[in-house]
Regions:
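A conserved helix-loop-strand patch within extracytoplasmic ligand-binding domains
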Residues: 124-174
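Short, well-ordered beta-strand elements
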Residues: 46-61, 79-84, 167-171, 291
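Ligand-binding pocket segment of bilobal, Venus flytrap-like solute-binding proteins
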Residues: 93-95, 101-105, 179-256
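C-terminal lobe and pocket-closing loops
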Residues: 232-295
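Ligand-binding cleft/hinge of the Venus flytrap
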Residues: 69-77, 163-198
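An extracytoplasmic/periplasmic, membrane-proximal ligand-sensing/linker region
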Residues: 50, 61, 188-195, 202-219, ...
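Immediate post-signal peptide segment of exported/extracytoplasmic ligand-binding proteins
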Residues: 41-54, 161-167, 330-333, 347
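A bilobed periplasmic-binding-protein/Venus flytrap-type ligand-binding module shared by bacterial periplasmic
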Residues: 138-148, 271-283, 304-307
């Protein structure tokens, strides 16, 4: 054992993790108890709101959105909420074929195709809000400490003029990812390799994330693609370099591997929304209003994901953490009656 370093056995590690989970689970139970109405009041509220179905998409940020929304609907509005496991394509297909679930949240519009456009145009669904602001973010990033030490690196021109300052390497997406095609075209458009920056194509998302973490923890250069909301973007202070103006036509062309003469364009924010069915909107205007207010900064969600990862927490436990530490944010989402019911949490 090295001096000053404590080595834990696997059993001790599991004990600590399980202890954390017990604490977080207890906190969730306590939070629910604080907000819970009396049995008689709850019965009246349930009859007023009734049953609500909401997607539980199979990625962490969406699960947190659902957990927060479910808690507020149940404890503030007396709803009986069922979280329906789903993904983008199954959710949009179910809306089209079955007019359910009632609420679909963290829907990445760019992945829904023409089905979403038709549902919206036909008035079958109502788009309530951008649940993540400004949406899904993509870019080419440097550690903020590197840009602060060398401000000229804030632009792609500055990076290409100083390849040694960024480690002489660009960390690219794995093969098969959509961002790989865009990045490859951007690399050609900028003549990046001619500036002395080699391109390293990662074999997986895990190695891409690990490369960032290793560089950051050693305060070494790192230059590459990443996106948010994600755990690494919440854990590490990163700066998106200026790639020039966004051009819709150029960006769309860059999504095709056979684009003959690619040009440069920055990445747009991907729209990520919450929608409800038209029928639900009419029957439950107060819940629709609530869900139109439930929105997170993309950076805040990345920080929540980082906290969840560091504490080996569940999505429900991350929701508790958010609710306990961000009252100023979510207290503005709920109506007066819900504020009264949840008053114990707002003290």
């Amino acid at each position: 054992m090295s001096p000053g370093k404590l080595t834990l056995s696997r059993g001790h590690k599991l004990t600590i993790i399980n202890s954390k989970r017990y604490i977080f689970s207890a906190a969730f139970a306590a939070l629910t108890a604080l907000a819970a109405p009396t049995a008689a009041t709850a019965a009246v509220e349930q009859s007023q709101c009734g049953e609500v179905t909401i997607t539980q998409m199979n990625w962490d940020s969406a699960a947190i959105v659902t957990a927060v929304s479910k808690f507020l609907m149940e404890q503030g509005y007396g709803c009986d909420v069922t979280a329906v496991p789903s993904d983008t394509t199954p959710a949009i297909t179910s809306l089209s074929e079955n007019n359910e679930p009632d609420i679909v949240t963290e829907l990445w519009v760019n992945s829904t195709g023409d089905v979403y456009k038709k549902l919206k145009a036909d008035g079958n669904i109502v788009e309530l809000t951008s649940v993540l602001d400004p949406g899904g973010v993509e870019g080419w990033w440097l550690p903020t400490y590197l840009v602060e030490a060398h401000p000229e690196l804030a632009t792609i021109e500055g990076v290409m003029a100083n390849p040694e300052l960024v480690g002489g390497m660009f960390n690219n997406c794995p093969d098969g990812w959509g961002c790989r095609i865009v990045n490859d075209n951007m690399i050609r458009a900028f003549n990046l390799e001619e500036s002395g920056i080699k391109v390293f194509n990662h074999g997986s998302g895990q190695t891409l994330a690990t490369s960032m973490a290793a560089a950051y923890q050693s305060e070494e250069p790192w230059f590459g693609y990443y996106w948010g909301p994600t755990t690494p973007m919440g854990k590490f202070a990163m700066t998106s370099i200026d790639l020039g103006e966004y051009d819709k036509d150029i960006h769309q062309a860059n999504q095709n591997a056979d684009t003959p003469n690619p040009k440069a364009s920055s990445f747009p924010a991907a729209p990520i929304v919450t929608v409800v069915t038209k029928d639900f909107m009419k029957a439950n205007p107060e819940i629709a209003e609530l869900m139109s207010n439930v929105t997170f900064k993309t950076s805040t969600m990345s920080q929540l994901l980082s906290w969840k990862d560091a504490n080996n927490a569940s999505s429900e436990e991350a929701a508790v953490y958010f609710l306990k530490n961000n009252q100023d944010a979510w207290s503005g989402w709920i109506n007066e009656a819900a504020t009264e019911k949840l008053s114990a949490l707002l003290k």
